[in-house]
A protein has these predicted regions:
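Short loop/turn segments that flank or connect secondary-structure elements
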Residues: 1-184
Length: 184
């Protein structure tokens, strides 16, 4: 079918399997489009340093990655997953890493994440990657800018003591940077 992808018939296995790392850009998009505070949909996990391109944040003197909150009922699905086929409750505003999945940026390219891929269908790396190149490039740009902001925030002597204050500082830093330099 034209416009169909391997995700078109999936029951959300990736949404039920993974923690989704987010950038300040993802957080802002979700916040603005859903009218929610970031704490309503973000949480943290121990740092994935070396496995994730997104720089870890220092919160309460711990190195953590900011991720989408997962359900607390034990299923562990993304807080926005509604179940069933095409079950993403924020599909139009989902994090860019969800948009490009199962591809992920690594040095030297964008391989399909086959080692732990929960997909029920197979992907044609060459064909399916071609349709995601612009999104992957945008993701890399956003990760680079996010990492720069996080590095500055992590280095400041007044580090965040909790997730809410960290996200607030990060969003303020993004807004200030955009107003001063007009980028992003």
């Amino acid at each position: 079918m034209v416009g169909e992808s391997p995700c078109s018939s999936c029951d959300g296995r990736c949404c039920r399997t993974y923690s989704v790392e987010v950038t300040v850009f993802d957080i802002r998009r979700l916040m603005l489009n859903l009218g929610l505070s970031p704490e309503a949909f973000c949480s943290t996990v121990s740092s994935w340093s070396g496995r994730c391109q997104i720089a870890p944040s220092l919160i309460a003197n711990q190195s953590v990655n900011v991720v989408l909150r997962r359900e607390e009922d034990g299923r562990g699905a993304c807080v926005f997953f509604r179940g069933g086929v095409k079950g993403c409750g924020v599909y139009q505003h989902r994090p860019r890493s969800c948009v490009v999945y199962p591809f992920r940026p690594v040095d030297g390219g964008y391989p399909v994440e086959r080692d732990n891929l929960p997909c029920p269908v197979s992907w044609n790396g060459r064909v399916d990657l071609a349709g995601r190149n612009s999104e992957l490039a945008l993701l890399m740009h956003e990760i680079s800018d996010h990492n720069r902001l996080v590095t500055v925030l992590n280095a400041e002597s007044m580090r965040s003591h909790d997730l809410a204050s960290h996200l607030s500082c990060l969003l303020d830093a993004l807004e200030l940077e955009e107003s001063q330099h007009g980028f992003m």
